[in-house]
Amino acid sequence: MILVSLLPLLFMTGIASESTISSGLASLKAKIDIKKPTGKQLFDKVKSMEQALENKFSDDDERAKVMGAIGSLGTAIGKFQSGDPASIASGCLDILVGISSVLKDFAKFSPVFSILSLVVGLFSGTKAEESVSSVVTKAIQEQSDQELQEALYGVKREFAVSKAFLDGVRNEESDLRPTEVSALAANIPVYQGVRFIAMVVQRIKYIKPKTESEIKRMLTMLELFTDLCSIRDLILLDLHQLIATPGHSPNIASGIKEVTSLGREEYQRVFEDLLKTDDEETFLFLSYLYPKEKNEQSRKIFKFFDLIEVKYDDRFKLDLSGGQALSTLQWPNYYLCPHNDYLANNCHDLRVGLKLEKLSDGFYTIKTYGRDPRTCYWTDDYVKISSTSNGELEKFSFVPVQVKGQKAYLLSTKKWPHNFAYSQKTANGLLSILKDVPSKLGYGNQGFFTISTYSNPKNRHA
Protein backbone atom coordinates (compact mmCIF):
# COMPACT_ATOMS: atom_id res chain seq x y z
CA MET A 1 0.00 0.00 0.00
CA ILE A 2 2.94 2.34 0.72
CA LEU A 3 4.17 1.60 -2.79
CA VAL A 4 0.83 2.60 -4.31
CA SER A 5 0.62 5.78 -2.20
CA LEU A 6 3.97 6.93 -3.60
CA LEU A 7 2.79 6.72 -7.21
CA PRO A 8 1.19 10.21 -7.41
CA LEU A 9 4.45 11.75 -6.20
CA LEU A 10 6.42 9.73 -8.73
CA PHE A 11 4.15 10.87 -11.54
CA MET A 12 4.29 14.54 -10.46
CA THR A 13 8.08 14.61 -10.39
CA GLY A 14 8.52 12.24 -13.32
CA ILE A 15 11.50 10.77 -11.46
CA ALA A 16 11.98 7.24 -10.19
CA SER A 17 15.50 6.10 -9.44
CA GLU A 18 16.80 2.58 -10.00
CA SER A 19 16.83 2.17 -6.23
CA THR A 20 13.13 3.08 -6.18
CA ILE A 21 12.36 0.28 -8.62
CA SER A 22 14.51 -2.11 -6.59
CA SER A 23 12.72 -1.00 -3.45
CA GLY A 24 9.37 -1.58 -5.10
CA LEU A 25 10.39 -5.06 -6.18
CA ALA A 26 11.74 -5.79 -2.71
CA SER A 27 8.34 -4.86 -1.32
CA LEU A 28 6.75 -7.18 -3.86
CA LYS A 29 9.09 -10.05 -2.92
CA ALA A 30 8.31 -9.51 0.75
CA LYS A 31 4.66 -10.27 0.04
CA ILE A 32 5.44 -13.65 -1.48
CA ASP A 33 5.17 -16.62 0.83
CA ILE A 34 7.89 -18.94 -0.46
CA LYS A 35 6.53 -21.75 1.71
CA LYS A 36 3.50 -22.03 -0.58
CA PRO A 37 3.77 -24.25 -3.69
CA THR A 38 3.80 -21.31 -6.07
CA GLY A 39 5.79 -18.99 -3.81
CA LYS A 40 9.31 -20.11 -4.73
CA GLN A 41 8.50 -19.95 -8.43
CA LEU A 42 7.03 -16.46 -8.10
CA PHE A 43 9.99 -15.29 -6.03
CA ASP A 44 12.45 -16.45 -8.70
CA LYS A 45 10.43 -14.73 -11.39
CA VAL A 46 10.41 -11.43 -9.49
CA LYS A 47 14.21 -11.63 -9.22
CA SER A 48 14.41 -12.22 -12.98
CA MET A 49 12.11 -9.27 -13.58
CA GLU A 50 14.25 -7.07 -11.34
CA GLN A 51 17.31 -7.77 -13.47
CA ALA A 52 15.36 -7.21 -16.68
CA LEU A 53 14.06 -3.84 -15.47
CA GLU A 54 17.53 -2.63 -14.57
CA ASN A 55 18.72 -3.47 -18.07
CA LYS A 56 15.69 -2.15 -19.91
CA PHE A 57 14.64 1.24 -18.54
CA SER A 58 16.96 4.23 -18.43
CA ASP A 59 14.49 7.09 -18.80
CA ASP A 60 13.28 8.55 -15.47
CA ASP A 61 9.74 9.17 -16.68
CA GLU A 62 9.44 5.64 -18.02
CA ARG A 63 10.68 4.24 -14.72
CA ALA A 64 7.98 6.14 -12.88
CA LYS A 65 5.30 4.67 -15.07
CA VAL A 66 6.76 1.19 -14.77
CA MET A 67 6.21 1.55 -11.05
CA GLY A 68 2.49 1.86 -11.71
CA ALA A 69 2.39 -1.59 -13.24
CA ILE A 70 4.53 -3.02 -10.44
CA GLY A 71 2.25 -1.37 -7.89
CA SER A 72 -0.79 -3.12 -9.31
CA LEU A 73 1.06 -6.41 -8.91
CA GLY A 74 1.84 -5.60 -5.30
CA THR A 75 -1.84 -5.22 -4.42
CA ALA A 76 -2.85 -8.42 -6.21
CA ILE A 77 -0.15 -10.87 -5.19
CA GLY A 78 -1.93 -12.17 -2.09
CA LYS A 79 -5.11 -12.84 -4.01
CA PHE A 80 -3.28 -14.95 -6.56
CA GLN A 81 -1.62 -17.04 -3.88
CA SER A 82 -4.92 -17.76 -2.13
CA GLY A 83 -5.93 -20.40 -4.67
CA ASP A 84 -9.52 -19.20 -4.36
CA PRO A 85 -11.08 -18.61 -7.82
CA ALA A 86 -12.99 -15.53 -6.63
CA SER A 87 -9.83 -14.01 -5.17
CA ILE A 88 -7.88 -14.80 -8.32
CA ALA A 89 -10.55 -13.07 -10.40
CA SER A 90 -10.37 -10.06 -8.07
CA GLY A 91 -6.59 -10.04 -8.49
CA CYS A 92 -7.03 -9.95 -12.26
CA LEU A 93 -9.24 -6.89 -11.89
CA ASP A 94 -6.65 -5.21 -9.67
CA ILE A 95 -4.01 -5.71 -12.33
CA LEU A 96 -6.35 -4.53 -15.08
CA VAL A 97 -7.14 -1.33 -13.14
CA GLY A 98 -3.49 -0.72 -12.34
CA ILE A 99 -2.31 -1.25 -15.89
CA SER A 100 -5.14 0.67 -17.57
CA SER A 101 -4.54 3.66 -15.29
CA VAL A 102 -0.96 4.05 -16.50
CA LEU A 103 -1.48 2.86 -20.09
CA LYS A 104 -3.21 6.16 -20.82
CA ASP A 105 0.12 7.85 -20.37
CA PHE A 106 2.69 5.48 -21.74
CA ALA A 107 1.08 2.99 -24.12
CA LYS A 108 2.64 4.72 -27.10
CA PHE A 109 6.17 4.06 -25.88
CA SER A 110 7.06 0.55 -26.98
CA PRO A 111 9.90 0.01 -24.43
CA VAL A 112 7.39 0.25 -21.61
CA PHE A 113 5.22 -2.48 -23.11
CA SER A 114 7.88 -4.96 -22.08
CA ILE A 115 6.84 -4.54 -18.45
CA LEU A 116 3.46 -5.96 -19.38
CA SER A 117 5.13 -9.00 -20.90
CA LEU A 118 7.06 -9.40 -17.68
CA VAL A 119 3.84 -9.12 -15.69
CA VAL A 120 2.33 -11.97 -17.70
CA GLY A 121 5.53 -14.00 -17.44
CA LEU A 122 5.58 -13.52 -13.68
CA PHE A 123 2.52 -15.70 -13.28
CA SER A 124 3.27 -18.33 -15.91
CA GLY A 125 3.13 -21.80 -14.47
CA THR A 126 0.66 -20.89 -11.73
CA LYS A 127 -3.07 -21.58 -11.54
CA ALA A 128 -3.72 -17.95 -12.41
CA GLU A 129 -1.67 -18.03 -15.63
CA GLU A 130 -4.58 -18.10 -18.07
CA SER A 131 -6.61 -15.54 -16.16
CA VAL A 132 -3.80 -13.02 -15.81
CA SER A 133 -2.51 -13.51 -19.33
CA SER A 134 -5.96 -12.97 -20.83
CA VAL A 135 -6.66 -9.91 -18.68
CA VAL A 136 -3.34 -8.25 -19.49
CA THR A 137 -3.54 -9.16 -23.18
CA LYS A 138 -7.06 -7.76 -23.34
CA ALA A 139 -5.93 -4.55 -21.68
CA ILE A 140 -3.11 -4.10 -24.20
CA GLN A 141 -5.37 -4.94 -27.15
CA GLU A 142 -8.17 -2.61 -26.09
CA GLN A 143 -5.74 0.22 -25.41
CA SER A 144 -4.06 -0.32 -28.75
CA ASP A 145 -7.40 -0.32 -30.57
CA GLN A 146 -8.45 2.81 -28.70
CA GLU A 147 -5.26 4.56 -29.79
CA LEU A 148 -5.97 3.57 -33.37
CA GLN A 149 -9.48 5.01 -33.12
CA GLU A 150 -8.10 8.24 -31.66
CA ALA A 151 -5.48 8.44 -34.40
CA LEU A 152 -8.21 7.86 -36.97
CA TYR A 153 -10.13 10.83 -35.58
CA GLY A 154 -7.05 13.01 -36.10
CA VAL A 155 -6.53 11.78 -39.65
CA LYS A 156 -10.22 12.25 -40.45
CA ARG A 157 -9.99 15.83 -39.16
CA GLU A 158 -7.03 16.44 -41.48
CA PHE A 159 -9.00 15.00 -44.36
CA ALA A 160 -12.03 17.14 -43.49
CA VAL A 161 -9.91 20.30 -43.56
CA SER A 162 -8.41 19.27 -46.90
CA LYS A 163 -11.85 18.54 -48.35
CA ALA A 164 -13.20 21.90 -47.16
CA PHE A 165 -10.21 23.64 -48.71
CA LEU A 166 -10.77 21.89 -52.06
CA ASP A 167 -14.49 22.69 -52.00
CA GLY A 168 -13.66 26.34 -51.46
CA VAL A 169 -11.22 26.34 -54.39
CA ARG A 170 -13.75 24.63 -56.66
CA ASN A 171 -16.43 27.19 -55.85
CA GLU A 172 -14.31 29.95 -57.35
CA GLU A 173 -15.21 30.54 -61.00
CA SER A 174 -11.80 31.81 -62.16
CA ASP A 175 -9.09 29.44 -63.39
CA LEU A 176 -6.26 28.34 -61.14
CA ARG A 177 -3.02 30.28 -61.53
CA PRO A 178 0.35 28.45 -61.35
CA THR A 179 0.96 29.84 -57.87
CA GLU A 180 -2.41 28.52 -56.75
CA VAL A 181 -1.53 25.05 -58.03
CA SER A 182 1.55 25.20 -55.80
CA ALA A 183 -0.65 26.29 -52.92
CA LEU A 184 -2.87 23.26 -53.49
CA ALA A 185 0.13 20.95 -53.37
CA ALA A 186 1.25 22.57 -50.12
CA ASN A 187 -2.14 22.35 -48.43
CA ILE A 188 -3.19 18.90 -49.69
CA PRO A 189 -0.17 16.59 -49.43
CA VAL A 190 -0.78 13.52 -51.58
CA TYR A 191 0.81 11.31 -48.93
CA GLN A 192 -1.75 12.39 -46.32
CA GLY A 193 -2.95 9.39 -44.31
CA VAL A 194 -0.71 6.88 -46.12
CA ARG A 195 1.23 5.88 -43.02
CA PHE A 196 -1.93 5.44 -40.98
CA ILE A 197 -3.58 3.38 -43.74
CA ALA A 198 -0.48 1.17 -43.83
CA MET A 199 -0.76 0.67 -40.05
CA VAL A 200 -4.35 -0.51 -40.38
CA VAL A 201 -3.45 -2.86 -43.24
CA GLN A 202 -0.72 -4.43 -41.10
CA ARG A 203 -3.19 -4.89 -38.24
CA ILE A 204 -5.63 -6.58 -40.62
CA LYS A 205 -2.89 -8.73 -42.10
CA TYR A 206 -1.68 -10.13 -38.79
CA ILE A 207 -4.84 -10.42 -36.67
CA LYS A 208 -5.53 -13.95 -38.01
CA PRO A 209 -9.05 -14.16 -36.56
CA LYS A 210 -10.06 -17.51 -35.07
CA THR A 211 -12.41 -16.61 -32.23
CA GLU A 212 -15.61 -14.58 -32.17
CA SER A 213 -13.92 -11.61 -30.46
CA GLU A 214 -10.99 -11.65 -32.91
CA ILE A 215 -13.37 -11.80 -35.88
CA LYS A 216 -15.41 -8.85 -34.61
CA ARG A 217 -12.18 -6.92 -34.10
CA MET A 218 -11.14 -7.77 -37.65
CA LEU A 219 -14.46 -6.52 -39.03
CA THR A 220 -14.02 -3.26 -37.11
CA MET A 221 -10.54 -2.88 -38.63
CA LEU A 222 -11.91 -3.53 -42.11
CA GLU A 223 -14.63 -0.93 -41.61
CA LEU A 224 -12.04 1.51 -40.30
CA PHE A 225 -9.92 0.94 -43.38
CA THR A 226 -12.81 1.41 -45.81
CA ASP A 227 -13.79 4.70 -44.12
CA LEU A 228 -10.27 6.04 -44.34
CA CYS A 229 -9.53 4.98 -47.90
CA SER A 230 -12.88 6.21 -49.19
CA ILE A 231 -12.27 9.70 -47.78
CA ARG A 232 -8.71 9.78 -49.08
CA ASP A 233 -9.73 8.66 -52.58
CA LEU A 234 -12.42 11.33 -52.66
CA ILE A 235 -9.91 14.06 -51.77
CA LEU A 236 -7.37 12.87 -54.33
CA LEU A 237 -10.09 12.69 -56.98
CA ASP A 238 -11.10 16.29 -56.22
CA LEU A 239 -7.48 17.39 -56.35
CA HIS A 240 -6.92 15.57 -59.65
CA GLN A 241 -9.99 17.14 -61.26
CA LEU A 242 -8.91 20.63 -60.25
CA ILE A 243 -5.32 20.33 -61.42
CA ALA A 244 -6.13 18.32 -64.56
CA THR A 245 -8.07 21.27 -66.01
CA PRO A 246 -6.55 22.29 -69.40
CA GLY A 247 -3.78 24.84 -69.00
CA HIS A 248 -2.84 23.78 -65.49
CA SER A 249 -0.33 21.06 -64.57
CA PRO A 250 -0.88 17.77 -66.47
CA ASN A 251 2.27 16.21 -65.00
CA ILE A 252 1.16 16.86 -61.44
CA ALA A 253 -2.33 15.60 -62.29
CA SER A 254 -0.83 12.41 -63.69
CA GLY A 255 1.23 11.98 -60.55
CA ILE A 256 -1.84 12.37 -58.35
CA LYS A 257 -3.62 9.73 -60.41
CA GLU A 258 -0.74 7.32 -59.83
CA VAL A 259 -0.80 8.05 -56.10
CA THR A 260 -4.53 7.27 -56.03
CA SER A 261 -3.85 3.71 -57.17
CA LEU A 262 -0.65 3.32 -55.12
CA GLY A 263 -0.83 0.36 -52.76
CA ARG A 264 -4.04 -1.09 -54.16
CA GLU A 265 -2.30 -4.26 -55.33
CA GLU A 266 -0.93 -4.83 -51.86
CA TYR A 267 -4.33 -4.18 -50.29
CA GLN A 268 -5.97 -6.53 -52.77
CA ARG A 269 -3.64 -9.37 -51.75
CA VAL A 270 -4.34 -8.80 -48.06
CA PHE A 271 -8.11 -8.87 -48.55
CA GLU A 272 -8.08 -11.75 -51.02
CA ASP A 273 -6.27 -13.81 -48.39
CA LEU A 274 -9.06 -12.98 -45.94
CA LEU A 275 -11.74 -14.07 -48.41
CA LYS A 276 -10.22 -17.43 -49.36
CA THR A 277 -12.95 -20.01 -49.68
CA ASP A 278 -10.51 -22.94 -49.91
CA ASP A 279 -8.81 -22.35 -46.56
CA GLU A 280 -10.59 -23.90 -43.58
CA GLU A 281 -9.07 -21.30 -41.26
CA THR A 282 -11.09 -18.55 -42.98
CA PHE A 283 -14.47 -20.31 -42.95
CA LEU A 284 -15.59 -19.00 -39.56
CA PHE A 285 -14.59 -15.44 -40.52
CA LEU A 286 -16.63 -15.70 -43.73
CA SER A 287 -19.71 -16.68 -41.75
CA TYR A 288 -19.51 -13.37 -39.86
CA LEU A 289 -18.82 -11.26 -42.96
CA TYR A 290 -21.31 -12.96 -45.27
CA PRO A 291 -23.95 -12.33 -46.56
CA LYS A 292 -23.03 -8.99 -48.08
CA GLU A 293 -26.37 -7.42 -47.13
CA LYS A 294 -26.47 -8.59 -43.50
CA ASN A 295 -25.74 -5.15 -41.97
CA GLU A 296 -24.27 -1.76 -42.79
CA GLN A 297 -20.79 -2.95 -41.83
CA SER A 298 -20.80 -5.84 -44.31
CA ARG A 299 -22.37 -3.73 -47.05
CA LYS A 300 -19.70 -1.07 -46.64
CA ILE A 301 -16.84 -3.59 -46.64
CA PHE A 302 -18.02 -5.43 -49.75
CA LYS A 303 -18.72 -2.15 -51.54
CA PHE A 304 -15.11 -1.20 -50.93
CA PHE A 305 -13.88 -4.62 -52.06
CA ASP A 306 -15.68 -4.05 -55.35
CA LEU A 307 -14.31 -0.52 -55.63
CA ILE A 308 -10.67 -1.61 -55.41
CA GLU A 309 -11.40 -4.74 -57.47
CA VAL A 310 -10.68 -7.35 -54.82
CA LYS A 311 -11.21 -10.81 -56.32
CA TYR A 312 -13.44 -13.13 -54.32
CA ASP A 313 -15.71 -16.11 -54.91
CA ASP A 314 -18.49 -15.20 -57.37
CA ARG A 315 -20.95 -17.10 -55.21
CA PHE A 316 -20.83 -14.22 -52.72
CA LYS A 317 -22.90 -12.36 -55.33
CA LEU A 318 -25.37 -15.14 -56.20
CA ASP A 319 -29.06 -15.25 -55.35
CA LEU A 320 -29.99 -18.83 -54.44
CA SER A 321 -33.74 -18.17 -54.37
CA GLY A 322 -36.00 -20.82 -55.86
CA GLY A 323 -36.43 -24.58 -55.79
CA GLN A 324 -33.13 -26.18 -54.81
CA ALA A 325 -31.75 -29.65 -54.27
CA LEU A 326 -29.49 -29.70 -51.21
CA SER A 327 -27.10 -32.55 -50.54
CA THR A 328 -23.76 -33.12 -48.79
CA LEU A 329 -20.32 -33.85 -50.16
CA GLN A 330 -20.30 -36.90 -47.90
CA TRP A 331 -23.48 -38.44 -49.38
CA PRO A 332 -24.15 -36.72 -52.73
CA ASN A 333 -26.96 -39.13 -53.71
CA TYR A 334 -29.16 -38.22 -50.76
CA TYR A 335 -31.06 -34.95 -50.46
CA LEU A 336 -32.38 -32.78 -47.66
CA CYS A 337 -36.08 -33.22 -47.00
CA PRO A 338 -38.55 -33.33 -44.08
CA HIS A 339 -38.35 -36.25 -41.66
CA ASN A 340 -41.25 -35.89 -39.22
CA ASP A 341 -40.63 -32.44 -37.70
CA TYR A 342 -36.96 -32.28 -38.65
CA LEU A 343 -34.84 -31.55 -41.71
CA ALA A 344 -32.82 -34.62 -42.68
CA ASN A 345 -30.47 -35.81 -45.39
CA ASN A 346 -32.28 -39.07 -46.16
CA CYS A 347 -34.27 -38.69 -49.39
CA HIS A 348 -32.92 -40.69 -52.31
CA ASP A 349 -35.20 -38.84 -54.72
CA LEU A 350 -36.81 -35.41 -54.60
CA ARG A 351 -40.33 -36.34 -53.60
CA VAL A 352 -40.56 -33.16 -51.54
CA GLY A 353 -38.48 -30.18 -52.65
CA LEU A 354 -37.08 -27.25 -50.69
CA LYS A 355 -37.59 -23.63 -51.59
CA LEU A 356 -35.08 -20.91 -50.69
CA GLU A 357 -36.29 -17.31 -50.36
CA LYS A 358 -33.75 -14.50 -50.04
CA LEU A 359 -34.61 -11.79 -47.50
CA SER A 360 -33.66 -8.10 -47.59
CA ASP A 361 -30.75 -8.66 -45.18
CA GLY A 362 -29.25 -11.35 -47.43
CA PHE A 363 -30.30 -14.34 -45.33
CA TYR A 364 -32.63 -17.09 -46.54
CA THR A 365 -35.69 -18.91 -45.38
CA ILE A 366 -35.90 -22.63 -46.20
CA LYS A 367 -39.41 -23.88 -46.89
CA THR A 368 -40.93 -27.19 -47.93
CA TYR A 369 -43.10 -27.69 -50.99
CA GLY A 370 -46.26 -29.75 -51.01
CA ARG A 371 -49.83 -29.42 -49.82
CA ASP A 372 -48.74 -28.20 -46.38
CA PRO A 373 -45.64 -25.97 -46.84
CA ARG A 374 -43.67 -25.44 -43.64
CA THR A 375 -40.62 -23.39 -42.65
CA CYS A 376 -37.30 -24.65 -41.29
CA TYR A 377 -35.79 -23.08 -38.19
CA TRP A 378 -32.65 -23.47 -36.07
CA THR A 379 -32.66 -24.89 -32.55
CA ASP A 380 -29.85 -25.62 -30.11
CA ASP A 381 -29.47 -29.15 -31.46
CA TYR A 382 -31.30 -29.63 -34.78
CA VAL A 383 -32.88 -27.97 -37.80
CA LYS A 384 -36.61 -28.37 -37.23
CA ILE A 385 -39.67 -27.69 -39.40
CA SER A 386 -42.81 -25.88 -38.28
CA SER A 387 -46.01 -24.29 -39.58
CA THR A 388 -45.66 -21.41 -37.10
CA SER A 389 -43.27 -18.46 -37.21
CA ASN A 390 -39.95 -18.65 -35.35
CA GLY A 391 -38.60 -15.17 -36.15
CA GLU A 392 -34.81 -14.80 -36.38
CA LEU A 393 -34.33 -18.57 -36.02
CA GLU A 394 -35.66 -18.97 -39.57
CA LYS A 395 -32.84 -16.88 -41.11
CA PHE A 396 -30.23 -19.17 -42.69
CA SER A 397 -26.88 -18.32 -44.23
CA PHE A 398 -25.16 -20.29 -46.99
CA VAL A 399 -21.43 -19.57 -46.71
CA PRO A 400 -19.58 -20.40 -49.96
CA VAL A 401 -16.45 -22.54 -49.46
CA GLN A 402 -14.30 -24.94 -51.46
CA VAL A 403 -13.17 -28.37 -50.30
CA LYS A 404 -10.35 -29.89 -52.34
CA GLY A 405 -11.52 -28.05 -55.43
CA GLN A 406 -15.21 -28.86 -54.91
CA LYS A 407 -17.58 -25.94 -54.42
CA ALA A 408 -19.80 -26.29 -51.38
CA TYR A 409 -21.61 -24.30 -48.69
CA LEU A 410 -21.64 -24.21 -44.92
CA LEU A 411 -25.11 -23.84 -43.44
CA SER A 412 -25.31 -21.31 -40.61
CA THR A 413 -27.76 -18.69 -39.26
CA LYS A 414 -27.96 -14.98 -38.61
CA LYS A 415 -28.44 -15.49 -34.88
CA TRP A 416 -25.46 -17.84 -34.40
CA PRO A 417 -22.92 -17.42 -37.24
CA HIS A 418 -20.40 -19.59 -35.36
CA ASN A 419 -22.77 -22.61 -35.35
CA PHE A 420 -22.99 -24.91 -38.37
CA ALA A 421 -25.24 -27.77 -39.49
CA TYR A 422 -24.06 -31.25 -40.42
CA SER A 423 -25.76 -34.47 -41.44
CA GLN A 424 -25.60 -37.20 -38.82
CA LYS A 425 -24.20 -40.57 -39.81
CA THR A 426 -27.46 -42.34 -38.97
CA ALA A 427 -30.31 -43.93 -40.90
CA ASN A 428 -32.45 -40.80 -40.71
CA GLY A 429 -29.55 -38.38 -41.39
CA LEU A 430 -30.96 -35.59 -39.21
CA LEU A 431 -29.28 -32.20 -39.49
CA SER A 432 -27.59 -31.46 -36.18
CA ILE A 433 -25.77 -28.35 -34.92
CA LEU A 434 -22.12 -27.82 -33.94
CA LYS A 435 -20.35 -24.80 -32.45
CA ASP A 436 -17.63 -24.70 -35.11
CA VAL A 437 -16.91 -25.82 -38.64
CA PRO A 438 -17.88 -29.55 -38.64
CA SER A 439 -14.78 -30.70 -40.54
CA LYS A 440 -12.57 -29.14 -37.85
CA LEU A 441 -14.36 -31.25 -35.25
CA GLY A 442 -13.84 -34.53 -37.08
CA TYR A 443 -17.03 -34.72 -39.15
CA GLY A 444 -15.34 -34.68 -42.55
CA ASN A 445 -17.63 -33.68 -45.41
CA GLN A 446 -20.88 -34.15 -43.45
CA GLY A 447 -21.21 -30.38 -42.98
CA PHE A 448 -20.43 -29.29 -46.55
CA PHE A 449 -23.56 -28.86 -48.65
CA THR A 450 -24.04 -28.66 -52.40
CA ILE A 451 -26.91 -26.76 -54.01
CA SER A 452 -28.34 -27.38 -57.45
CA THR A 453 -31.52 -26.08 -59.05
CA TYR A 454 -34.14 -28.63 -60.03
CA SER A 455 -37.14 -28.08 -62.27
CA ASN A 456 -40.84 -27.82 -61.47
CA PRO A 457 -40.62 -28.54 -57.72
CA LYS A 458 -44.21 -27.43 -57.11
CA ASN A 459 -45.48 -30.56 -58.83
CA ARG A 460 -43.62 -32.82 -56.45
CA HIS A 461 -45.57 -33.92 -53.41
CA ALA A 462 -44.98 -36.27 -50.53
UniProtKB/Swiss-Prot annotation:
One of its GO terms (biological process) is monoatomic ion transport. Nematocytes. The keyword Ion transport applies. Keywords: Cardiotoxin, Disulfide bond, Ion transport, Membrane, Nematocyst, Secreted, Signal, Target cell membrane, Target membrane, Toxin, Transmembrane, Transport. One of its GO terms (cellular component) is other organism cell membrane. Belongs to the jellyfish toxin family. Type I subfamily. May cause profound effects on the cardiovascular system of anesthetized rats (at 25 ug/kg), since the fraction containing this toxin and CfTX-1 produces an initial increase in mean arterial pressure, followed by cardiovascular collapse in all animals within 1 minute of injection. To note, the same fraction does not induce significant change in heart rate. Has weak hemolytic activity. Is lethal to crayfish. Causes cutaneous inflammation in humans. May act as a pore-forming toxin, disrupting normal transmembrane ion concentration gradients in susceptible cells. Oligomer. This is Toxin CfTX-2. It comes from Chironex fleckeri.
